[in-house]
Amino acid sequence: MLKKIVTALGMSGMLLAANSAIADDKNTEMATPQSVDLSPLRNLNKLDSPMGKNYDYHQSFKKLNTEELKKDMQDLLTQSQDWWPADFGNYGPFFIRLSWHDAGTYRLADGRGGANRGQQRFSPLNSWPDNVNLDKARQLLWPIKQKYGDAVSWSDLIVLAGTVSLESMGMKPIGFAFGREDDWQGDDTNWGISPEQLMSSNVKDGKLAPAYAATQMGLIYVNPEGPDGKPDIKGAASEIRQAFRAMGMTDKETVALIAGGHTFGKTHGAVPEKDIKKDIGPAPDKAPIEQQGLGWHNSYGTGMGDDTMGSGLEGSWTSTPTFWNHDFLHNLYNLNWEKTLSPSGAHQWTPTNAKPENMVPDAHKPGVKHKPIMFTTDLALKEDDGFNKYTQEFYNNPQEFKEEFAKAWFKLTHRDMGPKSRYIGPWIPEQNFIWQDPVPVADYKQVSAQDIAQLKQDIINSGLTNQQLIRTAWDSASTYRKTDYRGGSNGARIALAPEKDWQMNEPAKLEVVLAKLKEIQTNFNNNKTDGTKVSLADLIVLGGNVGVEQAAKEAGYTIEIPFVPGRTDATQAQTDIESFNYLKTKADGFVNYSDGSLASNKLPQALVEKASMLNLNIPEMTVLVGGMRALNVNYDDSQEGVFTKTPGQLNNNFFVNLLDMSTKWEKSDTNSGEYIGIDRKTGAQKWTATSVDLIFGSNSELKAVAQVYAENGNEQKFVNDFAKAWHKVMMLGRFDVQE
């Protein structure tokens, strides 16, 4: 039915941006490496923000009266508006859907999506078929946002709306954290294999494409009618499991969320199928200007209330759609379900043996009753063996069901916020969860400046090379993802599974470095009697700093990279191996690593994607690549891109030699993806390179930056800029401190 609506309305979908399409090698073809898209490295949201460069949400939040805000939200739930009447006189179910669909776009593969940043306010998400009419939900929240202003973000308010709604309807949440900051424009996430809304599936041969979480462009998870709109219960179960797992949910959490969410509210499909094209207007992004950002104008009947058109499915699941109960599971197991069609022609299921106590109230006409409904996806929770295990368990244990839903809801709405140290507000639960990537709180005294000096000397005397120290620190810190604030150096998870075993980290070499650093750590901690300790996480970063400083010294430059102690060491029990494997990248151009899954001409774009995840801009990415090549820290000791006669010294030789016209570049005849630098006069081979190396002389913007670092007189600038960018990467994920 959703596809029919999209087809009828002529919604052709959105063009996709290139940056995140790197995740699927078969999806994006670049004719040449120089066509690299640098837009992910431009922080346009910050430039476009109307809040000003000095605005600090955390500071502004301090003036928020959270209890007053909550009271206003509770009052709003039952203040039905004539322009969009509340079903059952309560906006609670509507706001739960708003929050869920905002947070539910999160995906583990690259950390994109989720409620943080409030992307649902912008195209394309605001116009997805699955988000039909949520423009009205956000409009209902506007008076509250207007009242509290910049003390509360849109992204926090949207999630809070659903959480307060749950509590008001008898489902007490385990807590809520503020701290989400708003974007000011739609991002360029690649949401599907095809740009056409609901026109093709992200599922091929029964498998969801690894880059995605929703099964089709324009959906949050799956089509409720079944795969591609077909009422196939078994197929629906498979797609549900894959989609929810791609968002980080277990089978138990998936069942709790679906069964709990469908305890509330109703779905809307009042418009007859034959009238949809005539009566339903376009989504917000294509709506007439006089509608002021509201879409899906409905000319059928009153266009609202009982005449509302949403997904096309029509009805409620339970007899008390504005109060938490056990009816969904009771109906699932005690009623016999037959396939029917909604007034809009959508596939749904109604019972053949409904009793008076099973009937559900009409959303707007007192005394009128209807049969309950189920989606094809709802029945999958009963028919699939894996899901059935938990629906039975919850059916027999209502209190467990309530508790598991509360935990799953908190995870759904907070998963993309990163570690708990980013949470603010009075309602943060004390409990820690493994999906928060917890790290221990330091119960010891941090190292002093004198201690740091001693440890640096211990590292210098350890016998570890600069290259070993630099690579280990880089591999530890560069796991960070700005999208969901995961990874980074804090926790020293490079010493734990799965990171210690990743090919890109060269496990055998890594083990040698970690053993030596642990020895230094043990000796230092055992010799301190004043309660001072140093973590392995801090030592890894300090070791990298030492390596860079020593390499600069060998090149004739004196630098001191700032070091901020306070990192702690996570345990294996605090580390979800499956979840952390999503932080493993296919390519890291900073060390010329590739796992072989990407074509050579896609490696420059993969570098940009990596740099974007590290929150770097174009000059920072450029100086880091040039410095890392000079430092000779490539994966597997490769010499590709090491354009220097003094490998291991921190200097600007990479840029000087890259831009030297005495060198002519040709593709290698023997090694695919490799380029040979040949002396124009003698014909002798001078260098070897990858497409990542040569992009800095090929792409006009990157070449402009490279030329700055190759200029006479800018040698010290290069070293200083490298040190600054290096420190930035080492500090990623340090939400426990503010520099």
From Swiss-Prot:
Keywords: Heme, Hydrogen peroxide, Iron, Metal-binding, Oxidoreductase, Peroxidase, Signal
Pfam families from the UniProt entry: peroxidase
Cofactor note: Binds 1 heme b (iron(II)-protoporphyrin IX) group per dimer.
Cofactor(s) for this UniProt protein: heme b
Cross-link (Tryptophyl-tyrosyl-methioninium (Trp-Tyr) (with M-247)): W100-Y221
Substrates-to-products reaction catalysed: H2O2 + AH2 = A + 2 H2O; 2 H2O2 = O2 + 2 H2O
Domain of life: Bacteria
Binding site for heme b: H262
EC class: oxidoreductase
Membrane-crossing segments per the record: none
Record-stated family: Belongs to the peroxidase family. Peroxidase/catalase subfamily.
Name of this protein: Catalase-peroxidase
Organism field: Francisella philomiragia subsp. philomiragia (strain ATCC 25017 / CCUG 19701 / FSC 153 / O#319-036)
Taxonomic path: Bacteria, Pseudomonadati, Pseudomonadota, Gammaproteobacteria, Thiotrichales
